Amino acid sequence: MSFSSLFFTAGFLPLFLLIYTAVPGVRRKNRVLLCFSLLFYLAGGLHYLLLLLLMTALSFGFGYLIEERRGERRWFVIGISLLLLNLAFFKYSAFFLRPLLPLLPFHLPGALLPLGISFYSFRLISYLSDIQSGRLRAQSFESLLLYTADFHIISQGPIVRFREMEAALRERRMSPEDFCEGMFRFCLGLSKKTLLADHAGKLAGQFLPLDFLHAASQGNPPSVLASWLGGIFYMLQIYLDFSAYSDMALGLGRVCGFDYPENFDYPYAAHSVRDFWRRWHISLSSFFRDYVYIPLGGSHVSLPKLCRNLLLVWALTGLWHGASWNFVLWGLYYFFFIMIENLRRRREREELEEERVGTGEEGERKEEEKDRDREEKPEEKAAESAGGKEGRGFPGFRRQSAGERGKRGREIRGRRLLSHLYTLLVVYFGWILFRFSDFHALIAALKLQFGIGASALWDPITALSLWNNLIFFFACLLASTPLFHYIGISMQNGLQQSLSLRRKEERRSERIRDNESFGDDSLQLFDRESEAEAENEHEIALRRIQLRARRRKRALRRAAFFYYLERGAAALLFLALSVMAMVGSSYMPFLYNQF
């Protein structure tokens, strides 16, 4: 079952939300969520559900053994080994046995991979690791099974840690605001998948199909323009597809009262390869950082060990994505660029440290010379106090002119633009490695990017297809940038400011009411005329404050009404367009279902 299927959208999800909202109490809601999660996973096959239950039961047992015998590391090693062996058997057995397949009496089908096994295996590994490190206590089987099988995140993540869900499993609330925001996020992700990602995938296959070598062998190879457009549309597809699922998962989580961590932060806006991986599949990157990279020493080690740590992390990252050599090559490709950027950062830190040390020694000598010069030339001292010379205690500092500041700003913007283009190019060629599992096709596709083996620089059919999809292309580009995110944030900030103003007015009215009794006691100190005037002025001031509070409250209600009306209307529009797209086109599964 997939989030982007009609059965899920029109049947499974409405039934779940109806029962989930009707059932009172967190414990009962947890059981409803658990039952629907098991039904969701059962759609993939009973044997895969039994496997998930078995892995959860083993992790439950080893969790208690690790906690009770914390000094004995063997239980932790055995538990992690069983989880990894299970993952390796189902995901990599065909990969390692591929040379022996002709000799085997049975066939290993590609559909052998259970749904979400990479994601729930890593979640269980993080669960045992956190118990071993003392960051988490062993949990009940029901809580652990819900954490493992939660249908929001079972198939494509994010890889949530148990401690990130622990508080919500015990106590959470469902507010109308959370329901509205969650459904908006879900419908936004659904439309991103059905309206943008699926069509981008079709265009990628049209411009540069996976079997383009067959057309090339018949004398009809793609043009350079077609090869680049195929790569660009695949680059857009894989981001829009995977981020769409994350949007839908986070939206469903918010509807149910969970606050899952963000998994994407507009990675195509990054300015370095390291920055890209801080924004792309954040939960996977943080998993390898916390459970592989940092235990090996992280970056605070010698250069050879740093190289070893990064090589292991990126080889595992590539293997995690798929059982094929092109994924290993893809991971090593990123290792190369990450290593270069780390070496550059190390060199910059060393140069800065040397400069700081040099400034400390040379700076004292220069300051002494400047003190002597200032005593001999008092006019320089006066000019220095006006900011025209180097400031005392800040060697080499002087106030920049407007022209110098503008030039400096242009240089910074130019460097940021170049670093952004460099990052996009690295990521673009990385997706070429990621897409083609056949090495002959991969090498031919890389050659096509530089015009080697292409039919021409461009061809009319490709140009016409691009022209017909130009608006769609810009829509995909805009969806890959944080523009609409910033618009939504500004709307939310406006609503939050209105809420804060309302709270201030309420606190002010409470202070006025609290002071009424004090004012009544004080009025007896004046004569009757002064008492009447003071009481009248007090009533007028109170009415003004109450009138202002009512106006602010009405304005807040209007702002909240129109804000949620816009969100609800947008969600319904996205949902309607997505349903029409699902009805009118063939089904395309999420790309990351294969991982």
What are the residue ranges of the model-derived segments?
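Membrane-embedded transmembrane alpha-helical bundles that form the catalytic cores
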Residues: 1-594
